[in-house]
């Protein structure tokens, strides 16, 4: 059986050239939800995507997935082409650069001062270090996070 990450890598490689501007491939996820496998292809464009956009992109992507040989999928799956939503993943250095000034959530591979998850305003990102302003109980603090220690980053909703 092929690992889920390998399936994501194969699908990303196949569909990326087919996603044309103004659309951007944000993420590919493959996971079991309930009893079904779901392949989620998250797409965005400036101003957001419409239902018509997702239908059009499904028509582009679906036939491409059928051409992958050998078939990497262990079982039937549901294809979902959708918007990344409000808590969009930030998977690349470019995505983080574009998120400067935004409220984000960052999970780390190893803790900084006994903290592995930071949520706050991304003040800057120079390609190597993220600087985040966050609340520690009742005080604002600033932390510098080396990019290579970031396990996951996403936009977050500030409540």
UniProtKB/Swiss-Prot annotation:
Lineage top rank: taxon: Bacteria
InterPro entries: Ribosome_maturation_RimP, RimP_C, RimP_C_sf, RimP_N, RimP_N_sf
Keywords associated with the record: Cytoplasm, Ribosome biogenesis
Keyword Cytoplasm part of the UniProt annotation: yes
Pfam family, any one: RimP_N
Subcellular location per the Swiss-Prot or TrEMBL entry: Cytoplasm
Any GO CC annotation of this UniProt entry: cytosol
Signal peptide: none
Protein name, as recorded: Ribosome maturation factor RimP
Organism per entry: Streptococcus agalactiae serotype V (strain ATCC BAA-611 / 2603 V/R)
Gene: rimP
